[in-house]
């Protein structure tokens, strides 16, 4: 007799969904777990950002910033490890990757929307397009400047410093050399940005606190890498 592709007794046919799960290898299970973990961590990261937008005081908290960086590192690490298993994926793995990529795309849209709303608020408050667009650029430039002039170990020191930063350091006045060091890092734009975009004493204090926080990080990096371009008293 010829073999047929249909099952003669439907009630005895194997469940295709159960069969698919049973055929997954340990590698695929790890991959799906890691990609799912990445999606969950990214969702939590977006919640962090939204909370910082609604409650600006959280953005200036070094402990909060340290947790934010740690969460982002953990999510990216899970994705990197997942891609290490990419060559051994089957159709199920690609299906999971498609779902995670869709979630990530939605997250990016949410993040872009939050950034756009912040930009519009800053533009409305200052009335200057140049100031509104310069704010995020200055913050990114400061972080990139640190990373470009430091070793991987110094970058680790910077991230650890985000968590173990002493809040009372913000109450100390900046010296002339420290101000000069900050101007070197951001091309002299940092203090112009803080003066132009703050309208109250509380916001001025928060901006100065952030400047000193970045200075604290730079001091810690300089101690470990002997940066020649940054001099402190």
Curated annotation (Swiss-Prot):
Residues 53-69, 115-233 are intravirion. Residues 1-31, 91-93 are virion surface. The chain crosses the membrane at residues 32-52, 70-90, 94-114. One of its GO terms (molecular function) is structural constituent of virion. Keywords: Host Golgi apparatus, Host membrane, Membrane, Transmembrane, Transmembrane helix, Viral envelope protein, Viral matrix protein, Virion. It is found in: Virion membrane; Host Golgi apparatus membrane. Pfam families: DUF2632. InterPro entries: M_Torovirus. One of its GO terms (cellular component) is host cell Golgi membrane. It is a multi-pass membrane protein. Interacts with many viral proteins in infected cells. Interacts with envelope E protein in the budding compartment of the host cell, which is located between endoplasmic reticulum and the Golgi complex. Forms a complex with HE and S proteins. Interacts with nucleocapsid N protein. This interaction probably participates in the viral mRNA packaging into the virus. Component of the viral envelope that plays a central role in virus morphogenesis and assembly via its interactions with other viral proteins. Belongs to the torovirinae M protein family. This is Membrane protein. It comes from Breda virus 1 (BRV-1). The lineage of its organism: Viruses, Riboviria, Orthornavirae, Pisuviricota, Pisoniviricetes.
């Amino acid at each position: 007799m010829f073999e047929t592709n249909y099952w003669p007794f439907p009630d005895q046919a194997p469940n295709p969904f159960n069969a698919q799960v049973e055929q997954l290898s340990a590698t695929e299970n790890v991959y799906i777990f890691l990609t799912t973990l990445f999606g969950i961590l990214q969702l939590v990261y977006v919640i962090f950002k939204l909370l910082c937008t609604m409650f600006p005081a959280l953005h200036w908290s070094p402990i909060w910033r340290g947790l934010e960086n740690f969460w982002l590192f953990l999510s990216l690490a899970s994705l990197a490890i997942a891609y290490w298993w990419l060559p051994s994926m089957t159709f199920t793995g690609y299906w999971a990757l498609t779902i995670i990529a869709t979630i990530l795309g939605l997250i990016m849209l949410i993040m872009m929307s939050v950034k756009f709303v912040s930009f519009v608020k800053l533009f409305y408050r200052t009335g200057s397009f140049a100031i509104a667009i310069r704010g995020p650029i200055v913050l990114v430039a400061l972080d990139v400047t640190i990373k470009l002039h430091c070793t991987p170990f110094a970058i680790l020191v910077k991230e650890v410093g985000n968590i173990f930063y002493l809040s009372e350091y913000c109450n100390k006045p900046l010296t002339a050399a420290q101000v000069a060091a900050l101007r070197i890092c951001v091309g002299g734009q940092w203090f112009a940005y803080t003066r132009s975009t703050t309208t109250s004493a509380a916001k001025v204090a928060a901006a100065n606190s952030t400047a000193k926080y970045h200075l604290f990080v730079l001091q810690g990096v300089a101690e470990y890498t002997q940066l020649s371009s940054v001099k402190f008293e």
